[in-house]
Each structure stands twice: as C-alpha cells, then as structure tokens.
Amino acid sequence: MASRKNQNIAIPLCLPNNCRWNAATGKYIKTGRQRTSLYVVEEALKKLKTVKGPVCVVSIAGPYRKGKSYILSEAFDQPEVFPLGHHFDPETVGIWMWIVPQKMRDSTGRECTVVLLDSEGIDAVMGEGLDDNQIFTLTVLLASVLIYNSAGVPTRHDLNGLDFIMKLSQRIRLCSNDGSVSASSPREDTEFFHKTFPFFIWLLRDVTQSIPTDCRDIKEYFLTRVFKDQGKERAD
C-alpha cells in the first residue's frame, strides 16, 4: 500500500490494472491480480480539465532506481512532489502527474502550464517487457519534452530503449485532422512528425569519465561512437 495524502504531491495519471486508487484516502493498493494493462485514473483527468490555455508536458523515462523522480522535481523547483523510495523495489508504478502551479513561458514567450509526468522505471526485476513497452509508449506519446535519464557511460541497453522510440514512430500512422490517412508528401510527414513527437533530451548522470580525445564534444561522441550506424539524422 502506498499513501498520497498530501495535496501538494503528485497523483497517478494511470496505474496498472492490479492497483486500485482511492481518491478519498489518497492511497493505492495492489489487488494481487495479474498485471496485464494500464487504466486512467479519473481524479487525474478532472485535474487536467481545469487547466486552461497552452500546456507543455514534460515526461521522464529510463531505468528504474536511477533518480528520475528526484530529477524531475528538482529541475522545475517542485521539491518532493514525486515520492522518493529507498528500497530495491521501484517506488513509482504507472505514470504519475503533477501540474506546476506557476505559469511558465516557452522559448517564444508564450505563457503555458507545465505538466510533469514521472513514469515507472524500466527493467525492474519484477517487471516484464510488456509492462515496459506500455509505459514507454504512453510516456513518449503524451510528452512535449521527453527526458531519458541514464546513469554512467551510455550502454547498449540504453540504445535499445531509444530504438524502441524509433520503432514506435515508424508504427504510428500520421493522419489528417478528419481522421483519414494522410496523403501528404514525405517532407510534410516529417514536419508533422517533428510537431507530434516530443523534443528529446538524453540526461547523462554520474558520468566521471572524459570523452575521447578525438571528439570535440559530447555531440560528436554520440555521432561517431553511439549512433555511428544510424547516422546524424537519427541522432538528431
């Protein structure tokens, strides 16, 4: 059982179907059922409906137990809105939401509401691949800005997570406003893709090693080492 009684902390946007949320008590419990899907929490939808004007959704994803909740809270000066765990098992299940009370301005000066989404960490020992895929898919599709949080030097496993995002983008059919399949040109589809999918940030944490001497900066390292087979377009 986990308690969320404080009004100044996040609530679940969606939970696994083996968890039940009680808005009156601010708690969720695990029912003992097998986890097979996610469901939307009605209280979170009600809170979202109160938001007026432009919205920027900032989501964070990555391996479990690597400090995602802490980073997301601190980056937007919203301390302790996402609960922090101190055990092997993950603290966050499903996707949790916090609406930043203060309005912010984007790069164009437009005022907007920032919604923070903290997602369940991938690769938990008690989790399954289907769970990770469901969480990762929703995190990508809901985000305006997606932060991928990893610790240490990038690994092949990190790339597998990014490869999932690329495959997801290839599977989604771009549709016109009326719901019919778009007959637009490849260039128009690419432009629409960049408007639809989130701005991506790979957050490298706790990296004490220096980049190779033949690389001018971290971007060149990614292009020549990490994404050498995918090319510059994929790295961007």
Describe these PLM feature segments.
Residues 1-236:
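Conserved GTPase G-domain substructure that encodes guanine base recognition and part of the catalytic core
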